[in-house]
């Protein structure tokens, strides 16, 4: 396994100008690592929708690198999106999957068949241009240059530890964050889209 | 001009260049025109809520996007509208082929077809029914203009009286 925060720290070194979206409990670490918030976009919240939304974003911005850090719980809700993505072959799309094998935000209940699913095989079978599977930080770090510099869609599955929250939702500490609408406006301003 | 061509022309009029859809025999009359026209980017989705997600992402990049689906598929995608499009203020024209209307042969389509417009009402989504070619251009153009002015999703429900439906 690789700590989610370490995944993001390694990725940040190779981000370049990529537009970055994160999802789920693991994705929250990105806020502490990112250095270009105007190119971060939030399509989370509606679980199961964000993969398709970032796919749509990649189609709309064919000249920008678009990176999505998905989670296995969200992806499983709409697994068919892998076929839709592979069918359109967005060469600018890099799809990471941080797999913590559970629904961490609701208390750590396992996703179905949590320990045995190989998501990179599902992505490969769907027709992604390249797929990877990492369990080791060093191996991941040394592969990032290749991952970020090849034609997509690329899929990268990484096992991460679950960061389970057991506090009732109302008692959890909330980070201040931009609303989804605000991240869309900020990105559009950054890209000079009227 | 056919009803489908009228809709395609209205899409262009409003610079809607990305169409995400789940196929249906009536919708095919529109998507087959779209597919041959280089102005459009036609994206096939495996499920209707996915089509809404794709349209939301495209809108974030400054590209207007519409979705096409059956009423049964609208049933699949209610939370994509309620949880993504509405709170993010993303205008998405949703073209719904309203099944369960005149001439319906499939019992599985009846309940969701009948429930679609009441559900749209409860969600607070404006919707208009397209059931003839009379004033069609005016209705579609007016609805699309409203959709972008209000920055909210809007539905256009197409019935068999418009497109002839499906017989088998």
Summary of predicted features, one role per range:
Chain B
Residues 1-168:
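Thiamine diphosphate
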């Amino acid at each position: 396994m690789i700590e989610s925060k370490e995944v993001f720290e390694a990725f940040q070194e190779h981000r370049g100008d990529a537009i970055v979206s994160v999802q789920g409990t693991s994705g929250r670490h990105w806020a502490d690592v990112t250095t270009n918030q105007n190119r971060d976009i939030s399509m989370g919240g509606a679980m199961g929708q964000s993969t398709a939304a970032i796919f749509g974003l990649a189609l709309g911005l064919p000249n920008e690198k678009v990176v999505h850090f998905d989670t296995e719980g969200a992806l499983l809700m709409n697994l068919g999106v892998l076929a839709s993505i592979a069918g359109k072959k967005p060469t600018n799309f890099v799809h990471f999957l941080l797999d913590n094998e559970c629904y961490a935000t609701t208390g750590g209940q396992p996703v179905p068949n949590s320990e045995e699913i190989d998501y990179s095989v599902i992505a490969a079978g769907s027709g992604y241009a390249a797929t990877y599977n990492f369990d080791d930080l060093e191996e991941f770090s040394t592969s990032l240059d290749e991952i970020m510099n090849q034609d997509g869609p690329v899929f990268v599955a990484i096992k991460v530890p679950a960061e389970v929250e057991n506090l009732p939702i109302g008692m959890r500490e909330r980070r201040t964050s931009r609303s989804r609408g605000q991240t869309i406006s900020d990105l559009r301003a950054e890209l000079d889209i009227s | 001009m056919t009803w489908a061509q009228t809709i395609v022309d209205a899409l262009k009029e409003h610079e809607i260049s990305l169409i995400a859809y789940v196929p249906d025999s009536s919708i095919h009359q529109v998507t087959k025109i779209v597919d041959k026209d280089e102005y459009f980017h036609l994206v096939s989705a495996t499920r209707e809520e996915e089509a809404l997600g794709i349209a939301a992402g495209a809108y974030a990049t400054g590209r207007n996007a519409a979705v096409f689906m059956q009423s049964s598929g609208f049933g699949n995608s209610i939370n994509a509208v309620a949880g993504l499009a509405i709170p993010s203020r993303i205008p998405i024209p949703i073209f719904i082929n309203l099944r369960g209307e005149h001439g319906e042969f499939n019992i599985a389509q009846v309940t969701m077809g009948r429930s679609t417009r009441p559900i749209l009402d409860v969600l607070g989504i404006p919707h208009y029914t397209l059931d003839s070619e009379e004033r069609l251009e005016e209705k579609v153009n007016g609805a699309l203009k409203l959709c972008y002015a209000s920055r909210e999703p809007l539905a256009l429900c197409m019935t068999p009286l418009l497109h002839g439906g499906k017989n088998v």
